[in-house]
Amino acid sequence: MTEFHSSCSRCVGRCFYCGGKSIKHGFTKENKQRYKCRQCHKTKVCSYQYQAYQKYINPYIISLTKEGLGIRSTARILKISATTLLKRIIRIAESIPQPSLKFAKSYEVDELRFFIGRKSQPRWLVYAIERETKQTACFYIGKRNNNTLNAVIKTLKNAEPTAIFTDKLKNYKTLIPKHLHKTSRYQTNHIERKNLTLRTHLKRFQRKGISFSKSSRITTAVLRIYFWGR
């Protein structure tokens, strides 16, 4: 429970959102004392009964998502609604900035096939990793066409890479300049190994499993947390 130390007759503590002074602001339906910040005007109570309002929930959501738990599994462990969890995942993902690409680096690009809702709706996850750091540089989800591939390739070309390594998929030849494109054997080992890790951690990408995605938006948010969340 948060303790408030009074410094005047009205101010009862500091706001943990902005650090401003908080004052009493009536009571909740459960007869709990409410507090309001005089600076950001946000309200709070000392202790929340619903777990989703706890400050530690968001870090737990990030941690459990990166460990590969599904939506309902995470909701059961944290004792919150699955609907609330979906909204929170989207909000967390939107707050995670995409890392800036470094200039004059080499990248590996590969694609994973999965489906949304049913197997008759296949999708591609196309992403790139920097060869030196092995970190994910960018990714895109879409249908199996050049537009999906080009969304990643175009981002990499803006960073003026020294080389882009891919498999021998014919689509890449029309998208990547010849002097940058490399398709030598064993040159995509790092991203191929990352594919295995990704399929192991996130069940929706497993080849033969009963888990699947219902929404491209949620899948994009989960990947953003998995790749760049901390």
What are these regions (language model features)?
Residues 1-230:
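Residue-level recognition of single "structural anchor" positions
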